[in-house]
Amino acid sequence: MSTVLCCVLVLLISVALCMDFEERPSSSWRSEQTMFLKSHKSRNLLSLRDLQQPDHGKMKRSEESAQNQCESLHGYQSTLQNDTHTHNFNDLSGSVSLAWVGDGTGVLLVLTTFQVPLFIMRFGQSKLYRSEDYGKTFQDITDLINNTFIQTEFGIAIGPDNSGKVILTGDLAEGKVTKIFRSVDFGKSFVTSELPFHPLMQITYNPKDSNILMVYSINYDLWLSKDFGANWKKIHESVCLVKWGIDDTIFLTTNPNGSCSDRGTLELRKSLDYGKTFKTIGNRIYSFGLGGRFVFASIMTDSGSTRMIHVSVDQGETWDMAQLPTVGHEQFYSILAANNDMVFMHVDEPGDSGIGTIYISDDRGIVFSKSLERHLYTTTGGDTDFTNITSLRGVYITSVLAEDGSVQTVITFNQGGEWRPLMKPWNGVCDSTAKHPSECSLHIHASYSISMKLNVPMQPLSETNAVGLVLAHGSVGGAVSVLSPDVYVSDDGGYTWFQALKGPHHYAILDSGGLLVAVEHNPTHPISQIKFSTDEGQCWHAHNFTDDPIYFTGLASEPGARSMNVSLWGYRDTILNQYWVSVTVDFRQLLSRDCQENDYIQWLAHSSDINSPTDGCVLGYKERFLRLRRDSVCWNGRDYKVTKEPTTCPCTLTDFHDFGFYHEENSSVCVEQPDLIGHSLEFCLHGRKEQLQTSGYRKIPGDHCEEGITPERKEIDLSKKCVSNLLRTEQLTKEHSFNSAPIIAVVIIVLLISAVAGVIFIKKYVCGGRFLVHRYSVLQQHAEANGIDGLDDLDTLEGGKTHYHDDSDEDLLE
């Protein structure tokens, strides 16, 4: 009877998840199970039928070895058994926080906390543990922080690079002063300091100097320390948002009336001398964001109901209007990714549609091309699947929303120039709900699926030093499935995929891709096995790490994918209590042999047609890498560096974006947009109106092609002033003076009338976007929660987050 009830319960939960995920009022269960974008196709989005061409069907590394049987790896069980280390944390902690200190040091700090609210008070305790051997053994060092309860919301603040600096913030009790605990020796010892304020956020380090710290107070005052927290000085009041810029620059927004809720009336200021002096560089600010060498400001227009983006490439000294659509109160801008060459910007559509358009900037951040329409980006939770595949340049994955509400994964291999569905895994079985065999593809689960509470424990994973490797949860069919996903692996940067593991798993990349590890995700049942692969996920082996299974909660390995140690965290549930358990497995003795020169082979990235002279050319050049042979069981080592050989390619039309034009399907030729025929493309540059003469092509930022095809492009100075909303009106009228008072009066009146008329005309018709279709978008909220700097963040506190949704490539503005 209990079995029947369980089955019924599982079925009901599955149906509920389907309805919750799709947000559609009615449809059959079968159609809700998977979804596919069919009815609407972006101009830059290739269909699956387009990919059935010979140049896209080349057999890849994973498929070439598919016929090889997995050979048994002898003797590994006894080897790993001797290198498996278990530690029990015998306290009543309800949560655990982990932080790696330094690179290659093996130092791991673990903070356990236990809290019990009692009426208007709360009781809590913290314990601090330290490991010097990658988590194999731990020492209780709680006495070093005087048994103080640590505020877990501030986390463990680790200094940049290999500074060895650590800061813990104590809990404020009974109105007393706040204490911080500082370490300069990787947590071996701590010094206690009292703060002259109560912090509102985690203390942040200067990225280039770990002795310089900055933090908000609960009164929105900005405090700075130059001696690693020993002494503090208040450098500004009424601070709404603050960020570290390049070259020790501090950017902040403030409101003279002290209210940060009046968005659109803020001032943007910067300091080059750690707060001794501040310079106002913008007014009417809603918010601002940083990305690469760009500074973006979201400002209110004269109407007070819309916002637009201004951009600066000289740290706010001069500003230009970004050619992006304006947005209203209910919309937002979001920087998805940025570097010194370009920016991906998401512009939200009006209404609560959950979609928008991705635009790509030029190298000045001013002119934008439309990259992808119907990009899925929910406004409520700020969830987007936009992911930078760091193991291969130019590759990004995200999701689009079809008009019927279905979700589909798309990928670009040339930095947003063209998007396409993912290829069906060569060993994958297409879901029966696919309407046509040609519509069967792989769909990746990322942030959106996690936010919808699907059974997805991890987002896609890639590492810069594990060339071509990508691990992700996904499903094969017509669209994203709400059923439990499987783990898929790509060894060529996302061109081809194969199913590596059945069901959801936690996974990690070790030894620069020479070793993959995974643990089954099953919150309701204890586990005792860890799986590992030495051939990029083709074959997997199981190691029983314990005879007493644990309820598994997470996998931890040192950042950078160079370690050979991985820790499984979980808890054991006894009759009397629960306690945390850490199991660390050292795989170094498994890969006992150092890799030699003959263990590596040459691999051409982005290869699709070996007979083409441009095979592998992406963004103007091709790269050949030395990669570990699939059948080589050896140790890359911590000092392993990616070996690559770049070769410049001649320019082709694929090295250019459309501007005022669009690609015809199955063609790289730009065709002029019907609504732009007969119109000039105009934009504002450094306060003057420019006219862009182009045959429809704009070179992709960061493209290094030489010679070959070079479409004509010319900018003409129209000698007409563009007035930036970022400057005060009185600042723009102090430019001319004459000797005669009457002439001055007449000229000033004429100039004022002309200026006002010109401003209205240019803002409305030129820079506002009547003629300009490909424009850049405003940045969205929650930018910092995802890592990149955002413009229109609703939450103005950084909270100690790092940069980008690239591993951090995401920025939001509004």
From Swiss-Prot:
UniProt modification remark: Palmitoylated. Undergoes cysteine S-palmitoylation which promotes the partitioning of the receptor into an endosomal membrane subdomain where it can interact with the retromer cargo-selective complex which mediates its retrograde trafficking to the Golgi apparatus.
Lipidation (S-palmitoyl cysteine): 767
The BNR repeat ranges on this chain: 129-140, 181-192, 223-234, 269-280, 310-321, 359-370, 410-421, 488-499, 531-542
A GO cellular component annotation in the UniProt record: endosome membrane
Coiled-coil intervals, chain numbering: none
Alphabetized SMART domains for the sequence: VPS10
Glycan-carrying positions: 82, 146, 257, 388, 544, 565, 666
Record key words, sorted: Cell membrane, Disulfide bond, Endoplasmic reticulum, Endosome, Glycoprotein, Golgi apparatus, Lipoprotein, Lysosome, Membrane, Nucleus, Palmitate, Receptor, Repeat, Signal, Transmembrane, Transmembrane helix, Transport
GO terms (BP aspect): endocytosis; Golgi to endosome transport; vesicle organization
Membrane-protein topology: Single-pass type I membrane protein
Record flagged with keyword Ribosomal protein: no
Bilayer-crossing regions: 742-762
Protein origin, superkingdom: Eukaryota
Ranges of the Cytoplasmic topological domain: 763-814
Stretches of the chain found on the membrane's Extracellular side: 19-741
Disulphides: 70-539, 240-260, 430-440, 595-634, 617-649, 651-705, 684-722
Compartments, record wording: Golgi apparatus, Golgi stack membrane; Endosome membrane; Endoplasmic reticulum membrane; Nucleus membrane
UniProt cross-references to Pfam families, sorted A to Z: Sortilin-Vps10, Sortilin_C
Signal peptide start and end residues: 1-18
Role: Functions as a sorting receptor in the Golgi compartment and as a clearance receptor on the cell surface. Required for protein transport from the Golgi apparatus to the lysosomes by a pathway that is independent of the mannose-6-phosphate receptor (M6PR). Lysosomal proteins bind specifically to the receptor in the Golgi apparatus and the resulting receptor-ligand complex is transported to an acidic prelysosomal compartment where the low pH mediates the dissociation of the complex.
Record text on subunit structure and interactions: Interacts with the cytosolic adapter proteins GGA1 and GGA2. Interacts with the heterotrimeric retromer cargo-selective complex (CSC), also described as vacuolar protein sorting subcomplex (VPS), formed by VPS26 (VPS26A or VPS26B), VPS29 and VPS35; which is involved in retrograde trafficking of the receptor from endosomes to the Golgi apparatus.
Annotated protein name in UniProt: Sortilin
Provenance organism: Danio rerio
